[in-house]
């Protein structure tokens, strides 16, 4: 029901990031749905061809799993049994799921072959890339075409970010941990002290990449994250949980990725952003001012690779563009842990709400405090 006319209801499309769920359940659900939805089936087939074509351009150790599987379902099944995180595989599977959900949702209703609106689009981290397709595609065929092109762009972006991270520290492992029950300001002071005390270089320092009122995600190389979580006398005492990110993102202090290489020369990049679509930057909370898909993705690459993700500011920004006197329909393109915060914000303004899960998957993992270690505080 993403673009279906529902009376005067306003629509919000929500695209989560790549860290929020086990990839297998949502890929399996899409695979099963494709048996009765030929356009989705065609997209999933095309997706694996695009992924394999891009993988063949890489070094032999990069994404090799993609070349040994016949379809995205097999990739998801094999990766579900993996011992170590692989951000390239995880992110690409999540992107296929987001794009696939968009294709499926429009295919379910033939009346969606024309542009309707307005539509507000909320994407978190790599979810913004699927949101860009929704911002520029006016019908099912355009969604299909742009989803295929932007999937290739997204693949190259993830490759660039993984390479940037491995150049800092090649070891496998998680690049993030999430702290709760501590303010951003206090956590920043603790991290500044930690970075200074341990003499960490600019590229290895711990930093806040994702922030909200109730929790903050800290990124750093795996060895630093492990030390922070288990051995640091002060930081290890603060309630935190591991976060399944295996590369550095939202990092203003790191080198900018090669945008020209990431974008390539695909024809769909000149597609205009539709006037009845509003997609919000996760760093400023304001609508992107891009006129074309190319300009939009350039801004999105900056938000993903360089700019801090402000959860509360983004939700405030999307709500500021709504008429709070009219009902709102939220279409969730897969699970997202940020949907409850969005619904609370809207409900507090007295808005009538309905939320649709476009595709089923694992419920987003809740942030549960880990027991502090028994070691005491020290300076």
Swiss-Prot record:
Keywords: Membrane, Transmembrane, Transmembrane helix, Virulence. The chain crosses the membrane at residues 87-107, 116-136, 141-161. Pathway: Mycotoxin biosynthesis. Part of the gene cluster that mediates the biosynthesis of the selective antifungal agent ascochitine, an o-quinone methide that plays a possible protective role against other microbial competitors in nature and is considered to be important for pathogenicity of legume-associated Didymella species. The pathway probably begins with the synthesis of a keto-aldehyde intermediate by the ascochitine non-reducing polyketide synthase pksAC from successive condensations of 4 malonyl-CoA units, presumably with a simple acetyl-CoA starter unit. GO terms for cellular component: membrane. It is a multi-pass membrane protein. This is Ascochitine biosynthesis cluster protein 8. It is found in: Membrane. The keyword Heme does not apply. GO terms for molecular function: transferase activity. Its main location: membrane.
């Amino acid at each position: 029901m993403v673009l279906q006319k529902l009376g005067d209801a306003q629509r919000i499309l929500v695209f989560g990031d790549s860290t929020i769920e086990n990839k297998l359940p949502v890929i399996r659900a899409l695979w099963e749905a494709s048996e009765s939805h030929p356009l989705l089936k065609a997209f999933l087939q095309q997706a694996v061809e695009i992924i394999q074509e891009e993988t063949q351009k890489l070094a032999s150790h990069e994404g090799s799993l993609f070349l040994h599987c016949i379809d995205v379902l097999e990739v998801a099944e094999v990766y579900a049994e993996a011992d170590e995180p692989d951000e390239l595989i995880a992110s690409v599977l999540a992107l296929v799921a987001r794009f696939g959900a968009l294709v499926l949702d429009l295919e379910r209703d033939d009346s969606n072959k024309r542009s309707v609106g307005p539509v507000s689009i909320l994407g978190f981290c790599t979810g913004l890339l699927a949101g860009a397709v929704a911002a520029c595609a006016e019908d099912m065929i355009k969604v299909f075409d742009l989803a295929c092109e932007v999937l290739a762009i997204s693949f190259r972006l993830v490759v660039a970010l993984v390479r940037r991270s491995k150049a800092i520290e090649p070891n496998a492992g998680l690049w993030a941990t999430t702290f709760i029950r501590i303010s951003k300001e206090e956590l920043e002071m603790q991290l500044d002290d930690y970075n200074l005390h341990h003499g960490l270089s600019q590229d290895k320092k711990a930093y806040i990449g994702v922030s909200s009122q109730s929790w903050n995600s800290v990124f750093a190389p795996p060895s630093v994250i492990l030390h922070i979580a288990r051995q640091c006398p002060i930081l290890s005492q603060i309630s935190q949980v591991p976060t399944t990110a295996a590369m550095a993102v939202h990092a203003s202090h790191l080198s900018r990725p090669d945008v020209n290489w990431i974008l390539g020369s695909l024809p769909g990049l000149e597609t205009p952003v539709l006037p009845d679509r509003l997609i919000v930057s996760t760093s400023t909370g304001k609508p992107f001012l891009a006129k074309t898909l190319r300009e939009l993705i350039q801004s999105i690459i900056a938000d993903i690779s360089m700019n801090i993700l402000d959860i509360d500011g983004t939700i405030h920004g999307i709500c500021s563009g709504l008429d709070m006197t009219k009902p709102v329909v939220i279409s969730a393109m897969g699970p997202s842990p940020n949907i409850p915060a969005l619904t609370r914000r809207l409900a507090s303004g007295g808005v009538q709400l309905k939320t649709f899960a476009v595709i089923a998957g694992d419920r987003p993992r809740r942030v549960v405090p880990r027991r502090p270690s028994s070691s005491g505080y020290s300076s």
